Amino acid sequence: MKREIEVEFNDLEWLYSPNWEYFDYGNCKRHLQVILPYRRKGLEKKYPVIFYIPGAAWHKQEMYNDLPKLAALAKKGYVIVSIEVRESDIAVFPVQIEDIKNAMECVVRKIHEFDLPFDANRFYLMGHSSGSHLAMMAVLHNACGRIEMPNVKGVILESTSSNLLICSNQPLPTGLSVRPTAVLLGVDSIENNKEIAYEASCESLIREDIILPPVLMFHCANDPVVSVENSRSLYQKLEENKHSVEYYEIKSCEEHGGNIYFSEPILSIIEKFIKSTQ
């Protein structure tokens, strides 16, 4: 049987480009996982770039599990760059902020070197769990003059572990025998180092006189891993200091991550946020 058919389709594709080395630290190399647009006849515009930092309680990240979900976000019209940072087991905070800076600067260089369809004027930082703590701390360190990194138009935080003191009061994550916040800071316990823990928390750097990009936050009300009080506290601090922030608390939900943050309602909110900040 032979048939001729006509098929209407969008020839815009999204490709996965693995393992871009962005920095060699000597004792380790760190890489990016990139999802980018492609059209055989060429692209007519440049796309906003979302730098995504996976959560892993600041330990070694699993860089591949989220890629299918991140592809759904990419198809809304974005480049996704997933950043592998140095885990707390080999380098204590704040070296991870340096990693984010180095990753972004690497992408800027590649944009110019290879004429990539990435819009260097529309960079966003996004993180989940411990990754969102690092994303927020990166823009705060930049705003306070501690580092200088490419301009960020907005920050997207999912289930943020923004307050290390709140995190230290939660039960240990399954499979861990040592508190992740203590490993992150290189101390024996948070209880004996509360000042250090506070200084590594987002609230410690938020002031009215600094300039921050708009912040979009999500957290499940009954998150079983990272207390929702992290996001509530961060939202209140940003509001009190007159910074632009939107917070969506997902009621009656006991999820920490996964498909909930890549559902159509959440993706639509992210899409609207990015359009409003361009």
Residue ranges and their predicted role:
Residues 1-278:
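Alpha/beta-hydrolase superfamily serine-hydrolase fold, recognizing
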